[in-house]
Amino acid sequence: MRLSSTNMDARKMLFAAILSICALSSKKILIYNEEMIVALCFIGFIIFSRKSLGTTFKVTLDGRIQAIQEELQQFPNPNEVVLLESNEQQRLLRISLRICGTVVESLPMARCAPKCEKTVQALLCRNLNVKLATLTNAISSRRIRFQDDLVTKFYTLVGKQFAYSCISKAERVEFIRESLVVLRMVRGGGFS
């Protein structure tokens, strides 16, 4: 069985590292303690895990991300709900403005001077602007509240996931990575 060049390079580097460690320790240049040994073992584990289990982690994470995205799609989109509400409010305001304009036009001119007509129009415009500002604030408030609710539920889910001691360390690391990906999407506005 022929080894690939990257495998051969990795083996050569490992062999060279072992030889240099042995040479340095025999000359008493490098002194080992428990922390150094643990750190070297950890680095070796990370390199081994990345090479041998990299695709397994990727497939598992992709599956979890897909499942989370499917669950998130079941929630109603707050932007659509607020947009429908704002369209309805605008339609009602237009109708009210038309009715008020008709009422003002139907008043006899003797009782309603041109100044009064301008005052009514100014009042209606001001009311319309206040409603529009309120609606804009409601949209942004609802969006922020939705994101905060989602983040809170995520933290709760993460806490419940770690509450059970039967979960392995690898599963915990995998779950943390998934959670971070989704939280970045939420905080960055990656989905609407």
From Swiss-Prot:
Source species, domain of life: Eukaryota
Gene Ontology terms: biological process: proton motive force-driven ATP synthesis
Major localisation: mitochondrion
One function term, GO molecular function aspect: proton transmembrane transporter activity
Name of one Pfam family that matches: Mt_ATP-synt_B
Membrane disposition: Single-pass membrane protein
Gene Ontology annotations for the cellular component aspect, listed alphabetically: mitochondrial membrane; proton-transporting ATP synthase complex
Annotated compartments: Mitochondrion membrane
Keywords: ATP synthesis, CF(0), Hydrogen ion transport, Ion transport, Membrane, Mitochondrion, Transmembrane, Transmembrane helix, Transport
UniProt keyword Transmembrane helix, yes or no: yes
Bilayer-crossing regions: 29-49
Known function: This is one of the chains of the nonenzymatic component (CF(0) subunit) of the mitochondrial ATPase complex.
Family: Belongs to the ATPase protein MI25 family.
Subunit structure: F-type ATPases have 2 components, CF(1) - the catalytic core - and CF(0) - the membrane proton channel. CF(1) has five subunits: alpha(3), beta(3), gamma(1), delta(1), epsilon(1). CF(0) has three main subunits: a, b and c.
Protein's recorded name: ATP synthase protein MI25
Lineage start: Eukaryota, Viridiplantae, Streptophyta, Embryophyta, Tracheophyta
